[in-house]
Amino acid sequence: RPLAEVDLVERTRYYRSAGGDALGERFFDAAIAALRSVERMPGIGSPRAGELCDIPGLRVRRVDRFPCGWYYFILADHLDVVRLLADPQDIAAMLDHED
């Protein structure tokens, strides 16, 4: 989804602004690695966020060394990657805003 791409760009800019180019690059690389792991093994993400928010099927794959994660659904023929959200964000509200 487009917002997931926007989230990646915005989070990368945030880390670059907060800690310089090297931190921005480390975040981007870690975020892409987490996303690729989901593409290879969709079940790797935790269903806990979906359970807590009462959103059936929602899974999250954490980004190593950063306080955020990819939120997605496993569909019959593809992955629906919804958002890349930072930990303190209200997940349910952000997903409602997407629709």
Task: Report each predicted region and the residues it spans.
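Arg/Lys-rich, positively charged N-terminal/basic patches that mediate binding to nucleic acids
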Residues: R1-A30
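Short, hydrophobic secondary-structure boundary micro-motifs
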Residues: G24, S46-G50, A93
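A short, surface-exposed loop/turn module that caps and links secondary-structure elements
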Residues: R36-V63
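Enriched for short, Lys/Arg-rich terminal
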Residues: V63-D99
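Generic structural signal for secondary-structure transition and capping sites
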Residues: R13, G20, R36, R40-I44, ...
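Generic amphipathic, hydrophobic interface segment in small proteins and small subunits
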Residues: R26, A31-R40
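Residue-level signal for well-ordered alpha-helical positions
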Residues: R11, M41, M94-H97
